[in-house]
């Protein structure tokens, strides 16, 4: 795997080089000292992956990520001194397309050893997603056996389920910021993000919306006006008693938490129609689940190509004819409001594409 390093600190660059070269098959394609240099180098020689610092002279990592994903896109991991202390910047970079984030593994401490192992794990996951890992079969989430549940659908709150990955935080903020405080539906979000950042994502989203955003915990139920966000590296899933749980299965599935696992659990146990949205992201996670939900009568939406940072997941959904509508985030918010209003009034909405 060809990996570039963008960092202005010599010690950090050396630490990253040592960590990367412990894995056969990894090579350093180039090193840049600031964002401007990285944008130029990437345009000439696009690597498989960039390890991007946040704070550098001339151009910082957020702006460099934005320009690279627009001009010569590739996978990007933010590697900086303290991810937790810079959560806002991290999610801003993720909104522009950064795939993940980890503390820089400065040599000599147990914490750095843990960071090094975490970095290699994240790189291995990205390698699977972009087809740069050793050939192995990628397991698919099991298809849910569809059964009906006895709870009458009129007792259940309107539900909006959203799946997102690369570029997701920005798209989520664009949608949630446009929903009113009295939005009459429950919302559940599965964003591909490491559990160490999930609390930070919730805090950041709470600053973007009038709704209440919180981590989904075991035993939670959907509630109007509450936005629940998957909060662990395990897969969020709805159980037959309509409470939320986490499951490790499928263990080797590269997307964690998985949108497909969540969507398929909704198709199995949620005995009411809802609205499901699949946003920007690498790979195909969520496409099968969205298709299944559409077949169960849900209103389904995929983000359009123009507004997607990575047109992978929504593209796969469109190819499966899983999306009733194909829209940018701002229009998705409008559609969600219309869906809730139509359901309250009992007026059906036509099945149209845009």
UniProtKB/Swiss-Prot annotation:
<comment type="similarity">
    <text>Belongs to the CheB family.</text>
</comment>
<dbReference type="GO" id="GO:0000156">
    <property type="term" value="F:phosphorelay response regulator activity"/>
</dbReference>
<keyword id="KW-0597">Phosphoprotein</keyword>
<keyword id="KW-0963">Cytoplasm</keyword>
<feature type="active site">
    <location>
        <position position="285"/>
    </location>
</feature>
<dbReference type="Pfam" id="PF00072">
    <property type="entry name" value="Response_reg"/>
</dbReference>
<keyword id="KW-0145">Chemotaxis</keyword>
<feature type="active site">
    <location>
        <position position="192"/>
    </location>
</feature>
<keyword id="KW-0378">Hydrolase</keyword>
<feature type="domain" description="Response regulatory">
    <location>
        <begin position="2"/>
        <end position="119"/>
    </location>
</feature>
<dbReference type="GO" id="GO:0008984">
    <property type="term" value="F:protein-glutamate methylesterase activity"/>
</dbReference>
<protein>
    <recommendedName>
        <fullName>Protein-glutamate methylesterase/protein-glutamine glutaminase</fullName>
        <ecNumber>3.1.1.61</ecNumber>
        <ecNumber>3.5.1.44</ecNumber>
    </recommendedName>
</protein>
<feature type="active site">
    <location>
        <position position="165"/>
    </location>
</feature>
<feature type="domain" description="CheB-type methylesterase">
    <location>
        <begin position="155"/>
        <end position="343"/>
    </location>
</feature>
<dbReference type="GO" id="GO:0050568">
    <property type="term" value="F:protein-glutamine glutaminase activity"/>
</dbReference>
<dbReference type="InterPro" id="IPR011006">
    <property type="entry name" value="CheY-like_superfamily"/>
</dbReference>
<dbReference type="InterPro" id="IPR035909">
    <property type="entry name" value="CheB_C"/>
</dbReference>
<dbReference type="Pfam" id="PF01339">
    <property type="entry name" value="CheB_methylest"/>
</dbReference>
<dbReference type="GO" id="GO:0005737">
    <property type="term" value="C:cytoplasm"/>
</dbReference>
<comment type="function">
    <text>Involved in chemotaxis. Part of a chemotaxis signal transduction system that modulates chemotaxis in response to various stimuli. Catalyzes the demethylation of specific methylglutamate residues introduced into the chemoreceptors (methyl-accepting chemotaxis proteins or MCP) by CheR. Also mediates the irreversible deamidation of specific glutamine residues to glutamic acid.</text>
</comment>
<dbReference type="InterPro" id="IPR001789">
    <property type="entry name" value="Sig_transdc_resp-reg_receiver"/>
</dbReference>
<feature type="modified residue" description="4-aspartylphosphate">
    <location>
        <position position="53"/>
    </location>
</feature>
<dbReference type="GO" id="GO:0006935">
    <property type="term" value="P:chemotaxis"/>
</dbReference>
<dbReference type="InterPro" id="IPR008248">
    <property type="entry name" value="CheB-like"/>
</dbReference>
<dbReference type="InterPro" id="IPR000673">
    <property type="entry name" value="Sig_transdc_resp-reg_Me-estase"/>
</dbReference>
